[in-house]
From Swiss-Prot:
Catalyzes the interconversion of L-alanine and D-alanine. May also act on other amino acids. One of its GO terms (cellular component) is cytosol. GO terms for biological process: D-alanine biosynthetic process. The modification N6-(pyridoxal phosphate)lysine is found at K35. The active site is at K35, Y255. SMART domains: Ala_racemase_C. This is Alanine racemase. Its cofactor is pyridoxal 5'-phosphate. It catalyses: L-alanine = D-alanine.
């Protein structure tokens, strides 16, 4: 078997996670967020596995066009909207919805001649202060969109939460109240809830939920695990041992002689490194799953390899599988060891890692 790392994607896990989220929000439609190459799981792979989703959320127009070219006919929404007037005919031609969050987008809609109107989701800045129109701007912007012949009616309404992944933080309630007050009585769909909103803030679920990381079996909350919500990891990042070596006490290993063995042991070298997207800053003790147990990384992660301490009496051999994260070793646990979030780990795999449906 090829010793190089691969990300094995489970279609059944993706479908299980979609079903679990529907159960969490039975009155809502699901806008499956597949931006950033399906959170590293493969854009078309994920979309085809989640064909029963009601729509897909994307960050960029090229992602939406790839889905249309791949035969995806569901509703598509550009979560950051469009950036050039020349994008608008593509939205029309490929039946792609757009978020409008900035005055420049509004002006382009007003000034461009289109063959038919575009479906717009007006983004309200309810407190995240990143994208969207402030409550003070909302009424004027809404009226301009209503008057614009290039905008399909009704206009849909959305916001995004800053702290929904902190279940005890009341700021999410503040944002919900601001959004609901501002949009009361207006027609159109409403969408507020990301993964954390769908899982932890049921009152935010609205007409559509927009789950991202949860679809891939990962909890959005630090210290939590997707399995606690009936979610199954969709990615197994696997490689192999390409060397097993006896190692003497007081001998270092790796660049900079960063780690020194306290006793005689056996070391395993795994064929994965920062050239594959595994973080170079993974500290000593970060777990890897080998033959049914966690073994710690020792020494520095290099471009193509990392080293694990298998233990003095280990019987592991060259060619044995090494799981970097997956069902047996949740990516949330690995991320916590490294001091990052699971989102970053799954989306930063490089093209050297083969992504395949398992």
């Amino acid at each position: 078997m090829n010793p190089f790392p691969r990300a094995e994607i489970s279609s059944s896990a993706l479908q299980t996670n979609l079903a679990a989220l529907r159960q969490q929000a039975p009155a809502s439609r699901v806008m499956a967020v597949v931006k950033a190459n399906g959170y590293g799981h493969g854009l078309l792979n994920v979309a085809h596995c989640l064909v029963s989703a009601d729509g897909f959320g994307l960050a960029r127009l090229d992602e939406a066009l790839e889905l249309r070219a791949g035969g995806v006919t569901a509703r598509l929404l550009l979560l950051e909207g469009f950036f050039r007037a020349t994008d608008l005919p593509l939205l029309v031609g490929h039946d792609i919805d757009t978020v409008v969050h900035h005055s420049s987008q509004l002006e382009m809609l007003e000034q461009t001649v289109l063959s038919k109107p575009v479906t717009v989701w007006l983004k309200v800045d309810s407190g995240m202060h990143r994208l969207g129109f402030t409550p003070e701007q909302f009424s004027t912007v809404y009226d301009r969109l209503m008057a614009c012949p290039n905008v399909a009616k009704p206009i849909h309404l959305m916001t995004h939460f800053a702290c929904a992944d902190e279940p005890d933080n009341t700021y999410t309630s503040v944002q919900m109240a601001a959004f609901n007050s501002l949009t009361a009585g207006l027609p159109g769909f409403r969408t507020l809830a990301n993964s954390a909103g769908a899982l932890y803030w049921p009152q935010s679920q609205g007409d559509w939920i927009r789950p991202g990381i949860a679809l891939y079996g990962v909890s959005p909350v630090t210290g939590d695990c997707g399995a606690n919500h009936g979610l199954v990891p969709a990615m197994e990042l696997v490689s192999q041992l390409i060397a097993v070596r006896d190692h003497k006490a007081n001998q270092p290993v790796g660049y900079g002689c960063f780690w020194t063995a306290k006793q005689d042991t056996r070391l395993g070298v795994v064929a994965i490194g920062y050239g594959d997207g595994y973080p170079r800053n993974a500290p000593e003790g970060t777990p890897v799953w080998v033959n049914g147990r966690r073994v710690p990384i020792v020494g520095r992660v290099s471009m193509d390899m990392l080293t694990v301490d298998l233990g003095q009496d280990a019987q592991d051999k060259v060619g044995d599988s090494a799981l970097l994260w997956g069902k047996a070793l949740p990516v949330e646990e690995v991320a916590e060891h490294i001091g990052t979030i699971a989102y970053e780990l799954v989306t930063k795999l490089t093209p050297r890692v083969a992504v395949c449906l398992a």
